[in-house]
Amino acid sequence: MERPVTEADLTFDHVPETDQSFENALTKARAGDRLTVDDAIELLTTGTDVDGIDQTRKERVLEAADHRRADVVGEEVTFVANLNNNVTTACNVGCLFCNFKDAAHTFERDTGMESAGFTKTPSESREIVADAVSRGVYEVTSVSGLHPAFALDGEHREILEAHPEPKAVNYKPPEAYEIDPGTYTDQISAMSVDGVHVHSMTPEEAYHARRGTDWSYEDVYGRLKAAGLDTVPGTAAEILVEEVRDVICPGKISTEGWLEAMEAAANVGLGLTATIMYGHVENEAHRAMHLKRVRELQERVDGAITEFVPLSFVHQNTPLFEHDVVSGGASTDEDELMIAVSRLFLDNIDHIQSSWVKYGDEQGLKMLSCGADDFMGTILSEEITKRAGGEYGEYRSFADYVDLVSSIGRVPVERSTDYETRRVIDPNDPPFGPRLGPKSDGTPILTPEERAPLADD
C-alpha cells in the first residue's frame, strides 16, 4: 500500500512578485493600504526572514488588526439566535478532513447494517425548526451530507431516475433507504417556518443539486430561493487552491466551481458568507491566496458577503489525522494570525467571526482582540465539529454571551443574520433572551432545567 500523501509532498512554491519584508507589509496594513498576497504571507508568518513565529512581531500584527476592527465596526460584539438543523450525515464524497459523514450505503434498507448517523424527513425538520422559533430563534443553519437520494426537486428526481448510469451521477432512489430525506426544496420549504431566516445550501450542496443536468447554478439557487432560502453559507471552501483540494477533498467541488456557485447565488438575490478551513496540509501562501480569491469574489458580488469565518481544522477523529497525513491542527499563534490577517486583508468585508465552537470561550474571546467582531450564535445543535472531536459544547445562551462579552469590556449586541438589525443589550437588565425574531420576547431560549443535561455532556 502506498504511503499517504503528506504536506511535504505538495509541490507548491510561492515566489514573491516583489521584494518584500515584514516591516513593509505591516506599514501598509497600519496605513489601511490594500495588501497583496506577498504582504499577507509576511504577516501570517511574522516574516519570511525568520523561522517560526516571532512573538513580538505577532503582537504587532494583532494590534494593527484590533485597531482596524475598532475603526471599521467599533466596540460591539455581535451574535445571533440560531439553530443548526443538519438534515443527514449520509455522504460518500470522502473528504479527508471530515468526520461528520457516515457512508451512504449504511443507510440502505437491505445492507443489514446499523448506521451511526441520521437522516431527517422534511416533516421532522419542520417540527425541529418550529420548536426553536417558538423559543425565540430566528435563524436556522443547515449543512448536510450529500445523500445519494437527494434531488433538487421533483423535476430533478425524474431526470435522475431516467439517467442511464445512476451511479455515475451518485444517485439512488429514496426507496433504497430506510428514511427518505425528500428533496432539497422540500427541506428548505419545511424549514421556512414563521418568518425564520433559512441559511443553507453551500456551493457543494448546489453542485449535488444539479448533477446529471445542464442546469446553471442560477437555476438551482433560483428554485431554492423560491422554496424559502434566504442566504448561502460559504462553507465547502476549505482552501481555494487546487493542489490543496486535490489532497484533502479530491471528489469535492473545484475552486472555480465554488466561486461560480457563490456568484450565482448572489445574482439571484441571496446573501452570502465566506469561510476558510485552515491548519491541515496547506501553508501560509495557500491561506493568503484563498483570502485574495474571497476579496475578489466580494468585489464581483457587489458586497453580498456579510462575514468571513476562519475555521480552525479540528483534527481528532478525521481521516487526515488517523492516516498520519497530519499530526495536528493549527497552533494558537496561527489561529490568532489567521483572524488578524483576515481583518487586515479583507478590506471589503466588515465582519470577521470568532468561532467559539472551534476555539472555546477563552480563546474565542481573545480573537475579539485580534480583529474579530462577531461571536457566532446560540447554536442549539452543532453535530459537525462535535463528531470531529471538538471539545467546546454545542450551545451558548444570551446570558453566556452577555457575561463573556462584558468581561472584556465590549458591548454585547444581538443581530440579525444580515447584520442589518441590531439590539444593544444592557448587562444590568436581565433576563437575557432574543428579541429580534418573529416570536422572540426576551425569554431565554432554554430553561435552566432544559440546559442542565447540556452542561453534563
Where would I find each of the regions flagged by the language model?
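Auxiliary Fe-S-binding modules of radical SAM enzymes
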Residues: 1-52, 56, 63, 133, ...
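Glycine-rich, proline-tolerant flexible connector loops at the mouths of alpha/beta enzymes
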Residues: 41-44, 81-83, 113, 142-179, ...
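N-terminal pre-triad scaffold of radical SAM enzymes
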Residues: 60-110, 117-144, 232
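Short, well-ordered coil/turn segments that N-cap beta-strands
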Residues: 71-77, 136-138, 192-198, 228-231, ...
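Active-site mouth loops of central-metabolism enzymes
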Residues: 82-83, 101-123, 205-216, 247-252, ...
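Generic structural signal for well-ordered alpha-helices
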Residues: 125, 129, 184-189, 218-221, ...
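Conserved strand-turn element in the central/C-terminal portion of the radical SAM core barrel
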Residues: 140, 145-150, 198-211, 240-242, ...
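Radical SAM/AdoMet-radical enzyme domain recognition
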Residues: 140, 166, 170-174, 178-274
